[in-house]
UniProtKB/Swiss-Prot annotation:
Possesses an unusual extended V-shaped dimeric structure with each monomer consisting of three distinct domains arranged along a curved 'spinal' alpha-helix. The N-terminal catalytic domain specifically recognizes the glutamate moiety of the substrate. The second domain is the NADPH-binding domain, and the third C-terminal domain is responsible for dimerization. Catalyzes the NADPH-dependent reduction of glutamyl-tRNA(Glu) to glutamate 1-semialdehyde (GSA). It is an enzyme of class 1 (oxidoreductase). The keyword Oxidoreductase applies. One of its GO terms (molecular function) is NADP binding. It catalyses: (S)-4-amino-5-oxopentanoate + tRNA(Glu) + NADP(+) = L-glutamyl-tRNA(Glu) + NADPH + H(+). SUPFAM superfamilies: Glutamyl tRNA-reductase catalytic, N-terminal domain (SSF69742), Glutamyl tRNA-reductase dimerization domain (SSF69075), NAD(P)-binding Rossmann-fold domains (SSF51735). During catalysis, the active site Cys acts as a nucleophile attacking the alpha-carbonyl group of tRNA-bound glutamate with the formation of a thioester intermediate between enzyme and glutamate, and the concomitant release of tRNA(Glu). The thioester intermediate is finally reduced by direct hydride transfer from NADPH, to form the product GSA. Substrate binds at residues 49-52, 109, 114-116, 120. Transmembrane segments: none annotated. The keyword Oxidoreductase applies. This is Glutamyl-tRNA reductase.
């Protein structure tokens, strides 16, 4: 048995191929059942996200193993092997162990250190548990991986700094204002970036959130989720003075918030400061706003500088995280090799016990039939000795015949012949 990881990800395949190899949540149970029907597969976990599709398997190692698994993957997704082969990567044994630990810790992610992948790995593991498709080795590996990912999070700073535009915008707001709990926030737009910003702000318990969008319908679902008020874009002028922080990200070709609008808001607020974060391209807020007193305007380029600085910090933390993964993967492989020894010892003891049981039964039967007890005992001892030393004797003879002195010495050591 060996552990194997294979897959494709954002580094090896374009989205046009990744989307054809993905497993939908509804199909995971069928995929696992089909996978475990393959003769060489003893257990499996299927991890499928927008950036990667990976199989983690415990398998019987054979020469045509890769070909069999490629054939299964291609048949399942109705692809030709030529479409997939060049994008597939393979990791065996310790490499498979360290790869999974790196993935779960965010070290192999498109955004270094992102935390979402750990939840996705846990979900994939839970699916395999539910479908009873885990081998003992895989179950132990994933449990170990979760503890390693937690250790990486707690012992390094890999997740401490913002490396997404949405997170950076919220980080900037928290740097300028000590607490967000007494502040009102206006979000302009209702796209993916604003969704992420809104969720971050909800976690920091802002006083009140307003979402302004071209249509109310698009913004209403997000507003319901985060407890926000919804207004339309034309209403911004009347409500701008209510906001301490304005974060904007729309696809508008022209600015939505102009200098005059901000001047009126500042006058209404009696010049209480306002933070503007414009993460739209083209810009949603006129650059001249940044020249007004008590109006602090940051563009997407300003956020990129924050992100680049934070990414450098994450890169430094990643070095420490890689060291943790290397250490823990070696620890796991030590345990795995020990399990192989346990199984061998169990088989050896079972074989010896079977010989003892068979020969004892014959000896007792002979005594019951009136045979001389001393003779039966001597014969039992003689036959038992011959049976137990037969296989080791053949191995010793073969090693000597082959001139394999290293193996011969190994056999002597295992039989305790050089012990005093």
């Amino acid at each position: 048995m060996t552990l194997l990881a294979l897959g494709i990800n954002h580094k090896t395949a374009p989205v046009s191929l990744r989307e054809r190899v993905t497993f939908s949540p509804e199909s995971i149970d069928q995929a696992l059942a089909s996978l475990l029907q393959q003769p060489l597969v003893q257990g499996g976990v299927v991890l499928s996200t927008c950036n990667r599709t990976e199989l983690y398997l415990s398998v019987e190692q054979q020469e045509n193993l890769h070909e069999q698994l490629i054939a299964w993957l291609c048949n399942y997704h109705k692809l030709s092997p030529d479409e997939v082969k060049k994008s597939l990567y393979w990791h065996h044994g310790n490499d498979a162990v360290s790869h999974l630990m790196r993935v779960a810790s965010g070290l192999d992610s498109l955004v270094l250190g992102e935390p979402q992948i750990l939840g996705q790995v846990k979900k994939a593991f839970a699916e395999s548990q539910r479908e009873q498709s885990l081998s003992g080795e895989l179950e132990r590996l994933f449990q170990k991986t979760f503890s390693v990912a937690k250790r990486v999070r707690t012992e390094t700073e890999i997740g401490a700094s913002a490396v997404s535009v949405a997170f950076a915008a919220c980080t900037l707001a928290r740097q300028i204002f000590e607490s967000l709990s007494e502040l009102n926030v206006l979000l302009v737009g209702a796209g993916e970036t604003i969704e992420l910003v809104a969720r971050h702000l909800r976690e920091h318990q802002v006083k009140h959130m307003i979402i302004a969008n071209r249509t109310r319908e698009r913004a209403q679902a997000l507003a319901t989720e985060v407890g926000a008020e919804v207004i339309t874009l034309p209403e911004i002028d009347a409500r701008l003075a209510d906001a301490d922080i304005i974060i904007s990200s729309t696809a508008s070709p022209l600015p939505i918030i102009g200098k005059g609008m901000v001047e009126r808001a500042l006058k209404s607020r009696r010049n209480q400061p306002m933070l503007f974060v414009d993460i739209a391209v083209p810009r949603d807020i006129e650059p001249e706003v940044g020249k007004l007193s008590n109006a602090y305007l940051y563009s997407v380029d300003d956020l990129q500088a924050i992100i680049q600085h934070n990414m450098a910090q994450r890169q430094a933390a990643a070095v420490q995280a890689e060291s943790i993964v290397q250490q823990e993967s070696m620890n796991f492989m030590t345990w795995l090799r020990a399990q192989g020894a346990v199984e061998t010892i169990r088989d050896y003891r079972s074989q010896a016990e079977q010989v003892r049981s068979e020969m004892t039964a014959k000896a007792l039967a002979a005594i019951e039939q009136g045979a001389n007890v001393e003779q039966v005992v001597n014969e039992l001892a003689h036959k038992l000795t011959n049976r137990l030393i037969h296989a080791p004797t053949k191995s010793l003879q073969q090693a000597a015949s082959d001139g394999d002195m290293e193996r011969l010495q190994l056999l002597r050591d295992s039989l305790g012949l050089d012990q005093h």
